[in-house]
Amino acid sequence: MTESQQAYAILDGRAEAGPGAPAQPCFLKTYRAVIAGGPDEQLPSEGILRDYLFKDSRKGRVFPVKRPRKGVREAVLEYRIVETAPDGSLSLAEITLHTGRTHQIRVQFASRKHPLYGDGKYGSRFKGDIALQSAGLQFVHPETGEKMAFQLEKPIKAPWDLNLSLIHISE
């Protein structure tokens, strides 16, 4: 079992920290993003995205690549589309990171033709701030062993409220 898998099992209550468990507290980070489009063949309504990412520091961008090589790191996230706008132009996704790579969420969705709202760097046609929110954090307290969980509510404004987004986009 990898360290990440162990962390999820502990936080979900399916396993106990014990011999071989990471000495550091295990963190489970969740995010919310508004993405272009709705579920399709490239991005079903839920799943796991697994890619190899290459960070090009000279260009200031991260690119998905086909296979591992020097400078390439695996990126894995789990997502679920929880809501899609009536016209199908935008969707709200909940995301759990299994790895934490630079621009990981942005690149993995954009590479499947679903860039984040406002993310012109990775292909969004929508103008505005990038619609990516750190939504939650879970960890086991290092001294008490208590499971700690913190959640943020979804903002009630465009583009987070998809109905308000449709009005905002059409203006």
Task: List where the protein language model places each region.
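RNA pseudouridine synthases
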Residues: M1-L166, S170
